[in-house]
Amino acid sequence: MAQPSPSFPFLYRPMVVAALGAGLGIVFFRTLTGTGPLLALCLFSILGFACWIKGLLPLRTFCLAVVFALLRVALLPELSLPSSIMAPFVQAREALLHITGRLFPQQDGALLSAMLWGDKSQLDTSLRAAYQGAGVAHILALSGLHVSFVAMALNWLTRRVDIRLRLALTAMALFTYCAIAAFPASLLRATLMCLCPLSAQAMGKKKDQASSIAFAALCILFCAPSALWDIGFQLSFGAVIAIAMLAAPLTERLPFPRELSESISVSICGLLGTLPLSAYHFKELPLLSLFANLLILPLVPLAFLWSMTACFLGLLYYPLGDLMAPVGRLLLNGMNGAATAVAGFPLSLMEVPKPSLLSCFLFYGAMLVLSRFCLLPARKKALAAAGLFAAAFLLMV
């Protein structure tokens, strides 16, 4: 979509602007005291009406999103499915966790329970520390990585099916998976983002990655505004936003075969997108994350899909699942060994002082300026990004 005015320095995506406004509205409601939220509601209502009259579309959308977010948080409770609807999914989750534990030894079973079904309660502390130290803890959290494996399998199975039927089957399968995993924010985000391009294709529309990310955020925040404060929500969106902003141009500049360049650029951008949040929440940075991702990620889809298939077959007929399980154990041992080895390197995890929120926002602002969404000339983009990065790092010192 074209920008609404020559003076606006960014590509205008109504969904993105609405998501930013909604996020600010939720922050206002939580942080302002007394009559603060009411004053913010009145102020942004007036500003939104003024921008509407003046034809300032981005500002109008932003202000109205702030207003609707304030009203949403003030008037409605957080939404969740009734226990009567969730009961079958809870039973399915328990059955899958049980068969996972039967098919795989204790450590492997605990790892797969986290990777496949989102249950980290049995995960070994030392193994969790190894994945965190290697900078690949995202493998343990259900997210876009895992949805991409499921979607890839579904796409192959339904490759000869009409796109509308494929959309319906994929949506049903992915939302069932979300329900079994108890709707973690990162998995729900990935599911919605996966369905947006399919929906656009089914309707004959052009897909847009930025709008898909924003739509996923709006859906999650409408149902549960408190998700904005969830670390998993922040890390998930931080990574995918950075990938959307910088992965494509970085891929074009890397002198490697296309697939390798894409893997490297996605890993780099995912790392950049989570660096400020890792420093802010955990006061540490995984310095070897890029190397660990390139080493371990090729094993993950094989281990994930093979082990998931073994679990489903084990539910139907245990000997079949037991027959497949040894290959899954072998793949998991490779992942665990690689993560433990990388985490054992000196300085694999560096402790850093907690940055300020302003420093984090400046860091993300610099990435936004460097992205294709910023319409400034290349020289101005480079200077502005350098200034923002410098300010972000100076505030951390």
Q: What does each model-found stretch correspond to?
A:
Residues F8-A74, R128-L290, P355-V397:
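Hydrophobic alpha-helical transmembrane segments in multi-pass membrane proteins
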Residues P105-G109, L123-T125, D162-L169, L299:
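Membrane-interfacial loop-to-helix junctions in multi-pass transporters
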Residues M1-P9:
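Short, Lys/Arg-rich, polar N-terminal cytosolic tail immediately upstream
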Residues H98-R102, A114-W117, A129, W156-R159, ...:
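Short amphipathic alpha-helical coupling elements at transmembrane boundaries
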Residues F8, L79-S126:
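Histidine-/acidic- and/or cysteine-rich, low-complexity loops and terminal segments associated
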Residues F10-V16, I85-Q91, G109, L116-S121, A181-S186, V342-F363, ...:
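Hydrophobic alpha-helical transmembrane segments
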Residues I243-L347:
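Alpha-helical transmembrane segments of multi-pass integral membrane proteins
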